[in-house]
């Protein structure tokens, strides 16, 4: 649909068609989903070559991720990476990295540090600026920027040997 608010009305049976059309046009197709495991999200995950799960240090977020990882393990899916975003809720630091790994029963592939917290992120978002291309952000947050670059390369790497449905 042209109006994103109507996206929830799209039947899951159209997702494979959308993926096939997008794969013919683009080298990389990004699909942003939400935590609820409905027909559309499950179908999108089935047809994805690689999946990036972004989690925070939030208990509800971690509980949802634990369930999703359990489903992936039960279905023998290995085509995912996990990014821990510590820069979003910088006040929520009551769980250590060890605690988070224990809760989700999985390793964390990439981490964004608390230092990557951008106070005026709305300003950049509204102007449409890509943070990884901003010189001052690159200068002050080089470690996190390099982490994101490595993650992006890992997401599009063909050597994973992980196939999505055709």
Protein language model regions, located:
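Conserved beta-strand segments of the P-loop GTPase G domain that flank and frequently precede/overlap
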Residues: 1, 32, 53-57, 80-86
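Inter-motif core of Ras-like GTPase G domains
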Residues: 38-58
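Beta-strand-loop-alpha "switch" segments that mediate conformational coupling across diverse proteins
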Residues: 88, 97-133
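P-loop NTP-binding core
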Residues: 1-9, 71, 77-80, 107, ...
């Amino acid at each position: 649909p042209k109006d994103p608010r109507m996206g929830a009305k799209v039947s899951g049976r159209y997702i494979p068609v959308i993926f096939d059309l997008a794969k013919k046009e683009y080298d990389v197709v990004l699909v942003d989903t939400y935590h609820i495991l409905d027909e559309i999200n499950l179908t999108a995950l089935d047809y994805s070559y690689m999946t990036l799960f972004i989690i925070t240090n939030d208990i509800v977020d971690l509980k949802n991720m634990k369930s999703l990882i359990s489903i992936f393990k039960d279905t023998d899916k290995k085509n995912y990476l996990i990014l821990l975003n510590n820069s979003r809720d910088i006040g929520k630091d009551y769980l250590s990295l060890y605690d988070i790994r224990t809760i989700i029963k999985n390793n964390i592939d990439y981490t964004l540090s608390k230092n990557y917290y951008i106070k005026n992120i709305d300003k950049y978002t509204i102007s449409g600026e890509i943070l990884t291309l901003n010189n001052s952000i690159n200068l002050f947050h080089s470690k996190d920027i390099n982490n994101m670059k490595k993650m992006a390369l890992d997401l599009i790497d063909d050597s994973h040997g992980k196939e999505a449905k055709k």
